[in-house]
């Protein structure tokens, strides 16, 4: 990449426009197969992009690359992709949980914004965790350490799924449409709104799909795409 693609970009831009095409360039170490061997067509271990995109999914591939320390070789294959896909499914399941029960109860996040004085301890905890993640994400991305951000995101996703939602399910399931139930919905909506905007640079397709169904369906004044939204504030 450095000798060919990046150099070609630099040479052509300098010659044709008199300026560099980029201010900062981030490269990574080698991509090898999941056993650490170089990929060769003759060895039968090469994975072509179109095949990987079809079988793994593009966002799964992007998650794999983003999670990798750029100073180390990436071990690329369908086995590691399956592990990442499980995490992506967890994110989707969090969204699906909210979407399913909010639809059943007719919850409108625009008409029922967060009432901060009515939040439970768990609500306050997950909101604090969310905004801490936003702050750390901003710090890591400024330093081009996407891998550090993704490691934090994976830990956060585990807490959101296995702690907040699992220990709050009865609040969503109960028949009474009271303020406690509305607070749970409003909190989860707030959390999802922030995390999909935060993760959009890494997972552009999944985040866009969630955004259109979650945010645009609720707020007609929201930007047309998640990729037109500002990065969330901590």
Feature roles, as predicted:
Residues 105-135, 166-234:
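Acidic, turn-prone loop/beta-hairpin segments
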Residues 5, 18-25, 61, 72-77, ...:
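Acidic/polar loop patches that form or flank catalytic/metal-binding clefts of enzymes
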Residues 9, 25, 60-68, 92-95, ...:
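Short alpha-helical scaffolding segments that buttress acidic/His motifs in well-ordered protein cores
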Residues 28-29, 91, 160, 204:
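Residue-level signal for inorganic ion chemistry
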Residues 78-84, 145, 180-188:
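Membrane-interfacial loop-to-helix junctions in multi-pass inner-membrane proteins
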Residues 30-116, 216-222:
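Catalytic adenosine-cofactor/nucleotide-binding cores of aminoacyl-tRNA synthetases and other
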Residues 137, 141-148:
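Short helix-adjacent coil turns
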Residues 2-18:
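Metal-dependent nuclease catalytic cores in nucleic-acid-processing enzymes
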């Amino acid at each position: 990449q450095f000798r060919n693609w990046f150099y070609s970009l630099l040479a052509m831009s300098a010659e044709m426009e008199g300026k560099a095409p980029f201010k900062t360039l981030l490269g990574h170490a080698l991509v090898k197969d999941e056993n650490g061997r170089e990929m060769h067509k003759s060895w039968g271990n090469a994975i072509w992009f179109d095949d990987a995109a079809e079988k793994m999914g593009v966002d799964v591939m992007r998650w794999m690359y983003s999670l990798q320390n750029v100073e180390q070789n990436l071990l690329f294959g369908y086995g590691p992709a399956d592990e990442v896909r499980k995490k992506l499914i967890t994110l989707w399941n969090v969204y699906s949980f909210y979407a399913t029960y909010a639809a059943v109860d007719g919850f409108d996040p625009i008409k029922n914004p967060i009432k901060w004085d009515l939040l439970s301890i768990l609500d306050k905890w997950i909101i604090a965790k969310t905004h801490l993640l936003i702050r750390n994400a901003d710090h890591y991305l400024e330093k081009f350490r996407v891998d550090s951000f993704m490691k934090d995101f994976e830990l956060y996703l585990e807490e959101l799924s296995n702690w907040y939602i699992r220990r709050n399910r009865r609040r969503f399931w109960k028949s009474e449409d009271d303020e406690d139930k509305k607070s749970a919905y409003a909190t989860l909506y707030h959390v999802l709104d922030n995390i999909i905007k935060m993760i959009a640079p890494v997972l552009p397709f999944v985040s866009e799909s969630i955004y259109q169904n979650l945010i645009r369906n609720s707020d007609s004044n929201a930007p047309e795409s998640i990729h037109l939204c500002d990065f969330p504030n901590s």
